[in-house]
Amino acid sequence: MLFAQAGASGSSQLLINARVYSPSHPAATAMAVTGDVISWIGEDDLGRAEFPDAEIVDLEGAFVAPAFVDAHVHVTALGLSLIGLDLSDVTAREQCLDRLAAYAREHPNEVIWGHGWDESRWPDGRPLTTTELDTAASGRAVYLARIDVHSAAASTALRQQVPGLAEAAGFHPEWPLIGAAHHLLRAHARGAFSAAGRAQARRAALDAAASLGIVSVHECGGPEIGGLEDFRELLATEHGVQVTGYWGEPARDPDHAGELVAATGAAGLAGDLFVDGALGSRTAWLREPYHDAPHTCGSRHLDAETVEAHLDSCTRAGITAGFHVIGDAAVTQVIDALGRVAERHGVPAVARCGHRLEHLEMVSAAQAGQLGRLGVIASVQPAFDALWGGPDGMYADRLGADRGTQLNPLALLASQGVPLAFGSDAPVTPMNPWVTVRAAAHHRTPSSSVSVRAAFGAATRGGWRAQGVHDGVTGTLTPGALASYAIWETGDLTINTSQPGVQRWSTDPRSRVPALPDLSDGAAALPTCLRTVHRGKVIHG
């Protein structure tokens, strides 16, 4: 098929011979775009008659659907993993160290920045040590972030460059660093990259997003993640993929909240404002000790007073607030604070801010109901469950089978009216939205699954809603909506079954429920993106 630029201002382009995913016309085979807006949806013959002067594009049976939004990413860090040392696919310590040694030989004059190792996938389950890195990299400065980016292994040469590292909480001379020690180390290693190097990484990440049918990403930045300089540079980057930034720094009062937003350019003071860490690094804050480390309940990064002050300040200022919460103790601390703020200022004042919680892996039914009543958005990553869920996964190792199989309860959240926005947390998990949708529909705890249709909505409309777009059409293919869509090569489409207790609809083709690609366990390859368009402009393909 031949593609041209989408319709210029005042002219129209008519896509025909397609399979169009539209709630307004489930059997549609054609879509007209005029400028940056979808102007019509229907069938081929009617489209030709309605738009006789339009440029015709024959899609030869391709699938046209709303473009995706990734509601939680770290753009520069993702780019560094794409153009640098990616360890996310290694399955043994020896393989990891061999790859590090080869990279060190090929890149002799730079700090080595790597990402993605996960010792829970290795035969002995032991993390990397300082001595092993020193040997493999021949004494070079090395920073290797664990897959969850809440701990990192580092060589002696890099450790010696960081003032005060040995005195920081979370330091160990041989094992990966966590907490304050890791934040010091990461900031120092990040400083070794030039502005040009950071720009190259960003472009690689945003290009990758566009190639996967993603037109908008939510950057979750903060002082302890990428730093203010990188955050501002990213928001100023010119690229077809839209970037909405959230800054993770606590506000003391409403004036301070406004000052932080003005200073950073952020859409809200949310995202990765850490209340705790991650389960893989045993830094998520739990009510009960870890099953495989009974001496610890993880780490708390913010106390209750700071959490409540932040929520109160942002609510009074009308600014979106949010936190990174994974462990049940962290989740409880934030939800309790939300309740007190709602009592003080009223539920409508809280709900209109669109506060959001990232990850939200351990949440009870009562807590989910409270979040639904307060209009709090759950920005979640279904691929976490695909990677680490189930009775034999890392979650079960860390928490035991009972607790470990109750994480990421997507169906519970949806049933309680909690708006879902799906993301990848890239580079933690792959930035492939069809992987995300499939993971949500095939949860390793089946009762926590949502339907493919609901998952697709959370990966498209859900992301727009989470960033404050409430027009009712953005994220859909409906006349009058912005022309943000992707064209996919895929096999048969199916009407997926609903999830009892969440949504119900008929799977009869006569019911006019729009069909989606087959994402069942036995399905063929995932859809391949042929073209991505945002606001009428082609950004990929």
Predicted regions and their residues:
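Conserved, mostly hydrophobic/aromatic
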Residues: S155, G213, G277, H324, ...
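Short acidic/histidine-rich active-site segments
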Residues: I319-D328, V380-P382, L413-V435, G480
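Histidine/acidic-residue-rich catalytic or RNA/ligand-binding cores of hydrolases
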Residues: T156, G227-D230, V331-G339, W388-Y395, ...
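Glycine-enriched alpha-helix->loop->beta-strand junction motifs that scaffold or abut catalytic
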Residues: T264-A266, L371-S379, Q416-P419, H442
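C-terminal cap of metal-dependent C-N hydrolases
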Residues: Y21, R438, T445-P446, S451-R461, ...
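Long hydrophobic segments that form regular secondary structure
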Residues: R300-R340, A466-V473, L477-E489
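Divalent metal-binding segments
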Residues: L2-F3, G10-D255, G280-A330, G354, ...
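Phosphate/diphosphate-binding loops
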Residues: E238-D272, G354-E361, A365, G393-V418
